[in-house]
Swiss-Prot record:
Part of the ABC transporter complex HmuTUV involved in hemin import. Responsible for energy coupling to the transport system. Transmembrane segments: none annotated. It is a peripheral membrane protein. This is Hemin import ATP-binding protein HmuV. NCBIfam families: PRK13548.1. Coiled coil: none annotated. Keywords: ATP-binding, Cell inner membrane, Cell membrane, Membrane, Nucleotide-binding, Translocase, Transport. It comes from Pseudoalteromonas translucida (strain TAC 125).
């Protein structure tokens, strides 16, 4: 389990997180939502160990995150940030293969290449493998980088270990088809034994795919629970200042947020 225990963080006088308690278990997709500036990306960075926390601790499998070496962490969790650009002209295949570093001591090159082929096919980027990454569209870059982090945790899944995948706004540059496809991939990875944390803005996507939702506001947890417990008219009004409700018609494949005018 990956946990934040009473975590607070600030930069200068700006408080980013205030006494956050959070957890994600194996076989679970947890979605973090909230308005701009709510602390979503800051919480994800804290869970990754990328920002200094002023209070509390982050634990992975009941061990302090700070006690892990960089190499061992790379085998246990993969992170996709909002900044997925690269300055060098790597091919798509080379970008995905960067994930092999974490596992090259335990797997043959042929096995690792098989993992790369699997995730590229799953994310529909195989046809781009010889293309230069810097020449791709924003959505294509995002899918390639997601393929890289999925490739990083794939060996741990095969070995029946429990990896964690943390992804920050993985659907921000994607069309509607690929938004649902990416979230379906995240859900699939969770069903295979991983713990997945995703920061997303689309509340309908959150309702459709999340096992649990954390709603943040002003650096605090405003609510947490299953989608129907969190996406209530009262909370949507208080946190987002919108009049809306969660529609979950059994005749429809996916629940969605209905605005009330």
């Amino acid at each position: 389990m990956l946990c934040a225990n009473n975590v607070s963080a600030q930069i200068g006088q700006k408080k980013l997180l205030k006494h956050i308690n959070f957890y994600v278990k194996p076989n679970e997709l947890v979605v973090i939502i909230g308005p701009n500036g709510a602390g979503k990306s800051s919480l994800l960075k804290a869970l990754c160990g990328d920002i200094k926390i002023n209070n509390g601790d982050i634990t992975l499998n009941d061990r302090l995150l700070s006690d892990y070496s960089i190499a061992s962490l790379a085998t246990l969790r993969a992170v996709l940030t909002q900044n997925y650009e690269l300055d060098f002209p790597f091919s798509v295949a080379e970008v995905v293969d960067m994930a092999h570093f974490a596992h090259q001591a335990d797997y043959s090159k042929q096995q690792l290449m098989h993992f790369s082929e699997q995730v590229m096919q799953a994310l529909s980027v195989t046809h781009l493998k010889t293309h230069t990454f810097t020449q791709l569209s924003g959505g294509e870059k995002q899918r390639v980088q997601l393929a890289r982090v999925l490739c990083q945790i794939q060996p741990s899944l095969v070995a029946n270990k429990t990896p964690y995948l943390l992804i920050d706004e993985p659907t921000s540059s994607l069309d509607i088809f690929h938004q649902y496809d990416v979230m379906a991939q995240a859900k699939s990875i969770a069903s295979q034994g991983a713990g997945v944390v995703a920061v997303i803005h689309d509340l309908s996507l959150a309702a459709s795919f999340a096992d649990r939702i954390y709603m943040l506001n002003n650096g605090e947890v405003a609510a947490c629970g299953i989608p129907k417990e969190v996406l209530t008219p009262a909370l949507l009004k208080r946190v987002y200042n919108i009049n809306a409700r969660l529609e979950n018609n059994t005749s429809e494949a996916m629940p969605h947020i209905q605005m009330c005018y």
